[in-house]
């Protein structure tokens, strides 16, 4: 059984990833500060003994013994970027630094998520997403 940390785990993608990894028999730690995520998204998971929900801001270092890290923490809309641009930058930059540091310390695999917002708005191409 793997110990897995998911930052931004109470967001849309994060909550679905938490559910999937629990279904596969893993121990899941979900971190979220609820800036854009919601505890409502993970309420069904709270009864699973292999699920732990922690309110935490990834711009502050976090310690855990884990095998894998999925760093999904970041406000997911330009609307939120404008509401609190400093928090957005802190979450993206310090969050990545903190999770990479944790991964190095505990020798964990890490997936660093990004956003379609890094692409050009002028692109005429359609985004194709495959699972």
Label for each model-derived stretch:
Residues 1-131:
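N-terminal Rossmann-like NAD(P)+-binding domain of SDR-like oxidoreductases, especially those catalyzing
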């Amino acid at each position: 059984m793997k110990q897995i940390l998911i930052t931004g785990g109470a967001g849309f993608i994060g909550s679905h990833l938490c559910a999937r990894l629990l279904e596969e028999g893993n121990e899941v730690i979900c971190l979220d500060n609820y800036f854009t995520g919601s505890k409502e998204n993970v309420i069904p998971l709270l009864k699973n003994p292999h699920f732990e929900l922690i309110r935490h801001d990834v711009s502050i270092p976090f310690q855990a013994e884990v095998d894998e890290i999925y760093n999904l923490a970041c406000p997911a809309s330009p609307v939120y970027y404008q509401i609190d641009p400093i928090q957005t930058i802190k979450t993206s930059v310090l969050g990545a630094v903190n999770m990479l540091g944790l991964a190095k310390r505990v020798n964990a695999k890490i997936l660093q998520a990004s956003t379609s917002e890094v692409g050009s708005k002028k692109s005429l191409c359609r985004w194709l997403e495959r699972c």
